A protein has these predicted regions:
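Membrane-embedded alpha-helical bundles of multi-pass transporters/translocases
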Residues: 2-471
Length: 471
């Protein structure tokens, strides 16, 4: 067995920094894919793919393709996790996957927005579908091993909160750069580029930055120096059955499924809320998102301390409650009198709390559940637990992605793709999903999980001290 080294701050930084790239790519896909390919009249973007409810009479093309992408992603999650958990690569079970997936992960995110023809048609439809699906496959190949590596390297629950805080910080700052897309697009348009080239130039810059950051862990982290793993010997189906037999895992996964679906509704529609519902220009979204991001970053130290002191469950429940209220405000308060920009900025400040909580603590909560299982079974199955959770949550997200585009067309005027009533309904449905998450997290017995982790940790520390005395 290898002598395990202490994980240094430099290694933690190398592990966390790819989240900046993931934040960039997530902003591209979650915030702008629907806006780019199902354009409103305010955007000036030409129509490039088939519009309307063309699949089964209820689904839009983009909604269907993205939903299928999430299903592909969900199905490949346990397959990749199983391969990673059982890998015998001399460089480790996780890092080699990340190394080879990094470049195609970034390139596929860019190529989604580079449909070759300037008008809707079969060629563009096929192009967009293939690269959306490729993006989700390479996302899985990179992120499942990446997520599984953390519980193996960091076993202290309080230190793990710190690492997830840094993880979230990089993700949020990457997302923040993604959120300034309208400003960068405007700058490129002012420089003489047409609207499509302006969007693509912006995303090309993001892609170059993202790929470089994705490759850093592969260069800097020598996995075998920080992890001693016991490979599982059971089959994929047995591993999945074992994961879902854990009651703590079931409740946490259900809560994250519902909360993540609610967030998908919000992210997919934020540009529409700003431009079509509030009547503000595209560039206003930059200021609004900046306020929510800066507000959430200011709350990070408080949330981190709260999570260490009282556990992750209470802050997450309150974060979901506040986010539910925010969604209901969008639905029922959109037509309230008052300056639109003032209302938008007020909402941005309000959602900064759930943004902070739901970016930091859910991952750390799941890592606790995974460690609990490892301590009770003696086998490291971090990959399959991450994949099982991802499988369920992505199926839920797929449902959301199918629903959102179909809802947004409700009440649309003739010749337009977006209706005010449909946007209000998306906010209402998103709020109901988040309310369901509150109930699921209430059912999770965090105290039982943490009690075992602390008990085993104290026992391990006592054993280590006894060895020192004996020597």
């Amino acid at each position: 067995m290898n002598q395990i080294q202490k994980v240094s701050k430099k290694i933690i930084l190398a592990y966390c920094i790819p989240q900046f790239a993931v934040g960039l790519f997530t902003a591209m896909i979650s915030n702008y894919l629907l806006y780019f390919y199902q354009p409103s009249k305010e955007s000036g973007i030409p129509t490039l793919v088939t519009q309307g409810v063309v699949v089964l009479g209820i689904l839009t093309f983009i909604g269907f393709v993205k939903a299928v992408g999430h299903v592909i992603d969900a199905v490949t999650d346990p397959l990749v996790a199983n391969l990673s958990d059982k890998s015998r690569n001399k460089k480790g079970r996780r890092i080699p996957f990340m190394k080879y997936a990094a470049i195609p992960f970034g390139l596929s995110a860019l190529l989604i927005f580079c449909a070759p023809q300037g008008r809707p048609g079969l060629v563009n439809n096929i192009w967009v579908a293939l690269f959306i699906w490729a993006y989700f496959i390479f996302y899985t190949l990179y992120m499942i091993p990446h997520n599984a590596l953390l519980p193996e390297m960091i076993t202290d629950t309080k230190e793990r909160v710190n690492v997830y805080t840094f993880n979230s910080l990089f993700f949020v700052t990457g997302s923040a750069l993604g959120y300034v897309t309208p400003a960068l697009v405007g700058m490129f348009k002012n420089a003489g580029l047409d609207v499509l080239l302006a969007w693509r130039a912006t995303f090309a810059i993001f892609t170059v930055v993202g790929i470089i950051l994705l490759l850093l862990p592969a260069v800097m982290i020598k996995e075998r120096e920080y992890v001693n793993s016991v490979r599982p010997t059971v089959s994929l189906m047995q591993s999945l059955k074992h994961a879902f037999s854990n009651k703590h895992f079931r409740w946490v996964t259900l809560g994250q499924l519902l909360e993540g679906t609610a967030m998908s509704f919000f992210q997919s529609c934020i540009m529409y809320y700003v431009t079509s519902l509030m009547g503000l220009p595209e560039t206003a979204s930059v200021a609004i998102l900046a306020i929510s991001i800066v507000g959430s970053l200011c709350l990070y130290p408080l949330i981190s301390k709260w999570g260490k002191k009282s556990g992750k469950r209470k802050p997450i429940i309150w974060g979901c409650v506040v986010f539910t209220i925010a969604e209901f405000i969008i639905c029922f308060g959109a037509d309230m009198p008052g300056p639109a920009m003032v209302k938008a900025c007020g909402l941005a400040i309000f959602v900064s709390f759930p943004f902070a909580v739901l970016n930091i603590l859910p991952g750390s909560m799941m890592a606790d559940v995974i460690q609990y299982d490892t301590l009770t079974t003696g086998i490291n199955q971090e990959g399959i637990f991450s994949a099982a959770r991802s499988f369920i949550t992505k199926l839920g997200t797929s449902l959301a992605i199918m629903i959102v585009p179909s809802l947004t067309v409700i009440g649309a005027a003739a010749g337009e793709n977006i209706g005010r009533m449909g946007l209000k309904i998306t906010a209402l449905v998103g709020g109901l999903f988040c309310l369901g998450a509150v109930i699921a997290f209430i059912m999770y017995r965090e105290e039982e999980v943490l009690a075992l982790i602390h008990k085993k940790g104290e026992g391990a520390n006592a054993g280590a001290e006894k060895k020192k005395v004996t020597k």
